[in-house]
């Protein structure tokens, strides 16, 4: 009797196993996996060289349109070191590496994590290499009327920075700041090009 029960249990399990393996549903053909969408291409903008082009003659120019010695914001600085010239000084800041070039007229801020240029600062020492007469005059004179003629009205009040003894005139929607540094009783004028920020 025990043998019959065991035999019946084994046959039942075999039948259930085969029934589970048999495809009661029609077989579906394997479909290839959908390809991921390509990342959106960055918007193409014309680029104007600070040392060759009359930048202010182009309507709507921003920091994204400006290159300095062939280097643009977002370029990997290791790839373009020779265009910038010899490194005269370096500093390590909290988020950036700062390198100084061109007779201390060009400051390049490189983001530590990506190695990409995220800010350029051009001061009056570099003005002799600037082609645009209006920008050259702004850097050499620091005249507020010239600043407003070239860049328009500021976006808010000037920012006082006690840490580096400077006053910054803000044009963040264009990625530009005009800065006046007080250094040893003298005023040094500079233009900072950085990533554009949204203003409200």
Question: What would you call each of these model-derived segments?
Answer:
Residues 22-25:
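Bacterial signal peptide processing site
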Residues 45-50, 55-61, 65-67, 72-121, ...:
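A cross-family detector of function-defining hotspots
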Residues 31-45:
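Intrinsically disordered, low-complexity proline-rich regions
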Residues 1-8:
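Bacterial N-terminal signal peptides that target proteins for export
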Residues 17-20:
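C-terminal motif of bacterial Sec signal peptides marking the signal peptidase cleavage site
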Residues 116-137:
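Intrinsically disordered, low-complexity Ser/Thr-rich linker and spacer segments
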Residues 10-15:
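Hydrophobic helical h-region of N-terminal Sec-dependent signal peptides
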């Amino acid at each position: 009797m025990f043998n019959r029960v065991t035999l019946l249990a084994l046959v039942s399990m075999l039948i259930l196993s085969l029934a589970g393996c048999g495809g009661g549903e029609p077989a579906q053909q394997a479909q290839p996996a959908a390809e991921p969408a390509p990342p959106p291409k960055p918007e193409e903008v014309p680029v104007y060289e600070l040392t060759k082009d009359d930048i202010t003659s182009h309507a709507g120019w921003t920091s994204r349109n400006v290159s300095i010695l062939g280097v643009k914001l977002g370029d990997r600085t290791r790839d373009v070191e020779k265009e910038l010239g010899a490194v005269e000084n370096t500093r390590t800041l909290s988020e950036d590496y700062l390198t100084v070039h061109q007779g201390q007229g060009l400051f390049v801020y490189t983001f530590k994590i990506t190695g990409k240029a995220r800010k350029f600062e051009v001061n009056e020492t570099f003005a002799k290499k600037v082609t645009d007469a209006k920008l050259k005059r702004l850097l050499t004179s620091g005249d507020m009327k010239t600043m407003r003629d070239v860049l328009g009205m500021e976006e808010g009040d000037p920012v006082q920075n006690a840490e580096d003894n400077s006053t910054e005139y803000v044009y963040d929607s264009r990625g530009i700041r005009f800065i006046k540094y007080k250094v040893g009783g003298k005023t040094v004028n500079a233009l900072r090009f950085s990533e554009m920020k949204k203003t409200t």
